Amino acid sequence: MFRGVYEHQIDAKGRTSLPAKLRDTLVGAYDERLILTTALDRCLHAYPVREWEALELSLAKRNPMEPGVKTLMRLYVASAQECPLDKLGRLLIPPTLRSYAGLEKEVVWAGMVKVIELWSREGWAKAQEEARQEATSADVMKVLAELRQA
């Protein structure tokens, strides 16, 4: 499972290193291929291919004319691109995805159990602040209580 937050740089060619701990999890549990796609929060999601294929199969079973499904397919599936790691553990992030997430020089990788988020440093700081403000909401507290009982 992916966990932790890691700050990295992105070079002029759009490459960034996948943090070693995330790479070890990826290689140990999956393989070295990631699917990058746009996320609804103006970041990118990096899925191991196996997790992505499971998501696609679940979506394929749904009615594509259902509004939520159609929107997810347009925003999530249509933007997805396979991005293998190079021999140095770097990922080339396509220009359209870099632009969408505002990735320029400093990026933040965030392990989110089965998916990895890739943020601009500024976007991550804003998302963290929003999460802190929501942390005491009844919904968050309910989920936390359920997790502790499991």
From Swiss-Prot:
It holds the Pfam family MraZ. It comes from the Bacteria. Residues 5-51, 80-123 form the SpoVT-AbrB domain. GO terms for molecular function: DNA-binding transcription factor activity; transcription cis-regulatory region binding. Keywords: Cytoplasm, DNA-binding, Repeat, Transcription, Transcription regulation. One of its GO terms (cellular component) is nucleoid. It is found in: Cytoplasm, Nucleoid. CDD domains: MraZ_C (cd16321), MraZ_N (cd16320). One of its GO terms (biological process) is negative regulation of DNA-templated transcription initiation. InterPro entries: MraZ (IPR003444), MraZ_C (IPR035644), MraZ_dom (IPR020603), MraZ_N (IPR035642), MraZ_sf (IPR038619), SpoVT-AbrB_dom (IPR007159), SpoVT-AbrB_sf (IPR037914). Gene3D superfamilies: Transcriptional regulator MraZ domain. The keyword Transcription applies. Forms oligomers. Belongs to the MraZ family. HAMAP family: MraZ. This is Transcriptional regulator MraZ. It comes from Myxococcus xanthus (strain DK1622). The gene is mraZ.
